[in-house]
Amino acid sequence: METRNILENLSCIDHSYSLSEADAFAGLSKYISEEASIRSCAKCEAALVKAHLKLRGQLTDAIASELDKVAENIDPQEVYTEEEKTKHNIRALVNVMKTKVNAEIGPLIHLGATSVDILDTALSCRMRDVTQNVVLPDL
């Protein structure tokens, strides 16, 4: 029997349909799975830090690259493990991200944002991307 990582699910009933529509599922999963949601939130947090640093005149290419790398390579399982302690998804993400950036940048992660700001912005970005990269090309 074939198995998949549950963080790649699109909904709670995916196991019933993901194998019969594997190509469609793979295309959608990159954008609307739980794993994609975590990565998208991390990208929003990174963009917020870059905005703070840019306003201060402190954003360098190296820092921007570091933030992009952290966001792209965030480990969803590590975030879930942290969430077991914090009982809060975005606080868990912020805590994990802070361990992966320079100590001087850490306090800027999530500064001035609410969890809903991050979740809604990330969702909007994912819906834009899945529409442009999966839905429209398949029409």
Residue positions per predicted region:
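A helix-coil-helix interface module used to build multimeric assemblies
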Residues: E2-L139
